[in-house]
Amino acid sequence: MVVKAVCVINGDAKGTVFFEQESSGTPVKVSGEVCGLAKGLHGFHVHEFGDNTNGCMSSGPHFNPYGKEHGAPVDENRHLGDLGNIEATGDCPTKVNITDSKITLFGADSIIGRTVVVHADADDLGQGGHELSKSTGNAGARIGCGVIGIAKV
């Protein structure tokens, strides 16, 4: 059974991101467009809570149900919400095109109801040596976010 989800991002960065998963255990395809980004890499994460009552800050930390360190999307030791970076050319829109095998739209670890956050700076993928590298990727301010909701199949 295919599951689809959508996230409308608001803030200084704005856009729409779609999620699609063919069945439990298969990769999730993440696609969409974001505007309002400076040229360069921007951290792109799923955060724990679907709460935007205080803007992006109330979305909590990266979604990390297994207590792992922050890492790159290809790392075994990473938060489930660590989706790496999206690259802005300086022109609108910035395309989002990610396939990830760790996030899911099924079961207890589903990202549906959680928040996508776009950050001001590049995610160092846990390799930067900064005190925040192993928790946030030192990706800077939260400049856009939105709650992931169920979409029509």
Curated annotation (Swiss-Prot):
Cofactor mode of binding and number, as noted: Binds 1 copper ion per subunit.
InterPro entries linked: SOD-like_Cu/Zn_dom_sf (IPR036423), SOD_Cu/Zn_/chaperone (IPR024134), SOD_Cu/Zn_BS (IPR018152), SOD_Cu_Zn_dom (IPR001424)
Pfam families (UniProt xref): Sod_Cu
GO cellular component labels: cytoplasm; mitochondrial intermembrane space; peroxisome
Keywords for this protein: Antioxidant, Copper, Cytoplasm, Disulfide bond, Metal-binding, Oxidoreductase, Phosphoprotein, Zinc
GO biological process: determination of adult lifespan; positive regulation of mitophagy; regulation of synaptic plasticity; removal of superoxide radicals; response to oxidative stress
Main location: cytoplasm
S-S pairs: 56-145
Cellular localization per UniProt: Cytoplasm
Reaction(s) catalysed by this chain's protein: 2 superoxide + 2 H(+) = H2O2 + O2
Gene3D superfamilies registered for this protein in UniProt: Superoxide dismutase, copper/zinc binding domain
Coiled coil start-end: none
Modified residues (Phosphoserine): 59
Positions of post-translational Phosphothreonine modification: 53
Amino acids binding Cu cation: 45, 47, 62, 119
Cofactor(s) of this protein: Cu cation; Zn(2+)
GO molecular function, one term: protein homodimerization activity
Database matches in SUPFAM superfamilies: Cu,Zn superoxide dismutase-like
Binding site for Zn(2+): 62, 70, 79, 82
Enzyme Commission designation: 1.15.1.1
Quaternary structure note: Homodimer.
Reported function: Destroys radicals which are normally produced within the cells and which are toxic to biological systems.
Family, per entry: Belongs to the Cu-Zn superoxide dismutase family.
Protein name: Superoxide dismutase [Cu-Zn]
Source organism of the structure: Drosophila melanogaster
